[in-house]
Amino acid sequence: VETEPEVFYARETDETKILYVGDPQIGASKGQPQNGEALTEEAGAANTAARNDGFAWNRTLETAFAQTPDINFVISAGDQVNNTGKPKEEEYAAYLFPKALKTVPVATTIGNHDSLNADYAYHFYNPNPTDNGLTEAGGDYYYSYGDGLFIVLNTNNYNVAEHAETIQEAVASDPSATWRVVTIHQDIYGSGLDHSDTDGMILRTQLTPVFDSYDIDVVLQGHDHTYSRTKMLYGDGQVHSGYEFRLNEDGSDYDWDHAYNVASGESIPLAPEEGDEAGAAALAAFQADNNCYTIENTTGNTVVDPQGILYMTANSASGSKYYELIGTQQDYVANRSQNWLPSYSIITMTDSRFQIDTYQILNDGTTEKIDDTFTIIKTK
């Protein structure tokens, strides 16, 4: 069988356009209503969910590329697929189906749903791979494009010393890059109900000072299936405990119900049972310790030569699954939304400007912005 030739675009880099997406998570709609019926039966449900989510994922990509035809490459903040720890080829087939992914590079991040199976590594050949941050799916990597140095960390591995080694190696490879951008899956500064105040921020106390020390400009995140943009943040300069998750007894997944203090080994219940006063106190102490940031005093949607770091969290680009926003917006959040619609961001990067515009796709296929344009300007 002879296939049609594909066209691959190598675009100009004086102004780089990046499509930034979160959590396509192909297959996650299984068990959720589809045309009035829930896909709860094991037989056939996974394939149907993969088909439906793949269709929606393709629609998002086609919409983004029609709106911005000169996209240089795509950044996915993780959870390409849904089926944690199991073979998931039907989900990867649907993820990779869109024609747009055959025309530009795609920089994927290992999410918690990708992490515990080697399938991810069979599909993505990442540049400058390291032996840091390894799980079954792979580890940290980095690359340069245009005026940016991009560092991708597998934060499903909680060894922050290894992630710091990756950042050090990456910065040494391109020390003059104007922009230093990190992509991680878990949103250490997010605003979703399911993750932002529990497992999402598990590495916040450890990664915040590391990002500060290497002058990172922007951190792109996923995981929480909501949209948020922070104020400009930097560490508070204090010493905080480190935290991690550990695998469950059979090693099939992480114990998401407990965080562990790295130094003491203390187990912290993230959802204490009613009446568990000790557990509630441990959780409160964990959350208080994660107030390890300082909010920079800036105004408006354009900042010039900021000291702090911008943290973005992308909502699901396919719409396969959404979460609620946390009840009380955190003080570090500048804007957030959950409109139960697929969304994506277009990043425009030059040697002096880093601009983010975020859109959602309405049911009729048109788009509208869900946040003001946010711009970082560098003059030095």
For the regions a language model picked out, list residue spans one by one:
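Acidic, histidine-bearing metal-coordination/catalytic regions of metal-dependent phosphoesterases
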Residues: 1-46, 304, 322-327, 340, ...
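Extended active-site neighborhood of metal-dependent phosphoesterases/phosphodiesterases
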Residues: 1-6, 10, 33, 41, ...
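Active-site neighborhood of phospho(di)ester-bond hydrolases with catalytic His/Asp-centered motifs
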Residues: 20-22, 73-79, 105-112, 153-154, ...
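Acidic/histidine-rich helix-loop elements
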Residues: 20-59, 125-133, 190-197, 322-337
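Solvent-exposed loop/turn segments at secondary-structure junctions
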Residues: 24-28, 80-84, 112-116, 147-150, ...
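Core catalytic region of metal-dependent phosphoesterases/phosphodiesterases
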Residues: 54-116
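C-terminal or late-domain output modules
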Residues: 59, 63, 67, 102, ...
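Short acidic, glycine-rich surface-loop motifs adjacent to enzyme active sites
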Residues: 77-81, 174-194
